[in-house]
């Protein structure tokens, strides 16, 4: 009697199941959210882009997105610091706003100490078909909106090392020019003079607009291309962050957002500064779909259909008029048989 052997497909299935069970036992999430769609809600008037807790957001149903730890490249994160992010979106004729909400026991908005890291969140948009979710690729890049809690705190006034160590002596101090032009000819602040966005003397937004085409290629857009706004608020252990942008801006480095078009492919990520999250150490989702509703049609938009309806009615009327002028056949009218004479 021959021995039965398992087919390769079944062996792989059993192996995958065993790995899943093992990861579940040690507390590592096996998958992130699958096949999730975020439905933007159309609203009339302005969007609450500066008010994360505005009542208008209650009209947008939150989509719960499960995150996994980024475990592809170092610094890795096996267990996500932020397990779930709730995503909502509102849109009008000109603008889109996306709200990210997640639970966080601490409010981390300073990076001035060596061992302090900021809370953060990001939304990435695929710029091509088949784009890798891991920072994109040359054949299909990413447009990334990156909100940083420390940048949000700097909007009220840029903080510096003196805020952490106010009595620290120094040999020579070059004060930062709050006009954003650098410290002047006698100063030497390399980051600011090189135009590093992280060293900027002034913050105009808490969100950085970036692009990437693979690992190690994350690049901020030029100052003129920074067109994403941000607003955030921390309440009772919950972060709410709103990122917004005009739907159409003509920037080739930005994602194209068009109401009623095919769903836009996005992903989200979150960082918990109190747990040392920074750079690649983050909680991430898989690809999601962002669906923007079709713009309601007005009378001007409906003119082709109205024209077709009028033409159809005119043609129907002409057909009926033509038919009414034809002699009736077989309905009691004069006989069409010839008179041969001599008939009965």
Tell where the protein language model's regions lie, with residue ranges.
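Acidic/polar low-complexity flexible segments
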Residues: 5-7, 27-58, 113-203, 250-344
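Surface-exposed, low-complexity/disordered Ser/Thr/Gly/Pro/Asn-rich loops and linkers
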Residues: 190-225
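Early extracytoplasmic/domain-onset interaction patches
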Residues: 48-52, 56-59, 71-74, 79-86
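Short, well-ordered beta-strand segments enriched in hydrophobic/aromatic residues
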Residues: 51, 95-104, 239-245
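Long, well-ordered hydrophobic secondary-structure segments characteristic of membrane-embedded
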Residues: 75-105, 110-114
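A mature extracytoplasmic/lumenal domain signature
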Residues: 91, 102-104, 127-129, 245-247, ...
């Amino acid at each position: 009697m021959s021995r039965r052997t398992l087919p390769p497909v079944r062996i792989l299935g059993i192996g995958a199941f065993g790995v899943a069970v093992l990861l579940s036992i040690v507390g590592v999430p096996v998958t992130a959210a699958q096949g999730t769609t975020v439905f933007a809600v159309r609203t009339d008037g302005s969007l609450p882009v500066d008010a994360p807790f505005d009542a208008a957001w209650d009209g947008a149903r939150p989509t719960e997105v499960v995150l996994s730890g980024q475990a592809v490249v170092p610094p890795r994160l096996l267990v996500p610091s932020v397990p779930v992010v709730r995503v909502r979106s509102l849109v009008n004729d000109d603008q889109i706003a996306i709200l990210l909400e997640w639970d966080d026991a601490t409010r981390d908005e300073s990076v001035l100490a060596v061992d302090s890291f900021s809370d953060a969140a990001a939304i990435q948009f695929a710029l091509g078909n088949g784009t890798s979710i891991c920072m994109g690729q040359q054949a299909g890049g990413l447009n990334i909106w990156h909100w940083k809690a420390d940048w949000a705190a700097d909007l009220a006034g840029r903080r510096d090392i003196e805020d952490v160590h106010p009595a620290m002596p120094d040999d020579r101090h070059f004060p930062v020019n709050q006009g954003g032009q650098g410290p002047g000819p006698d100063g030497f602040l390399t980051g600011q003079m090189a135009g590093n966005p992280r060293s900027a003397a002034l913050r105009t937004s808490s969100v950085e607009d970036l692009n990437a085409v693979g690992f190690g290629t994350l690049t901020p857009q030029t100052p003129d291309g920074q067109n994403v706004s941000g607003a955030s608020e921390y309440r009772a252990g919950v972060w709410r962050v709103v990122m917004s942008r005009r739907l159409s801006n003509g920037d080739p480095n930005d994602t194209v957002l068009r109401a009623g078009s095919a769903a836009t492919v996005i992903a989200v990520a979150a960082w918990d500064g109190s747990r040392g999250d920074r750079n690649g150490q983050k909680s991430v989702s898989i690809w999601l779909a962002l669906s923007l509703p079709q713009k309601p049609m007005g009378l001007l938009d409906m003119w082709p259909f109205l024209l077709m309806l009028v033409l159809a009615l005119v043609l129907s009327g002409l057909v009926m008029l033509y038919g009414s002028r034809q002699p009736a056949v077989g309905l009691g009218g004069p006989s069409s048989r010839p008179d041969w004479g001599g008939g009965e």
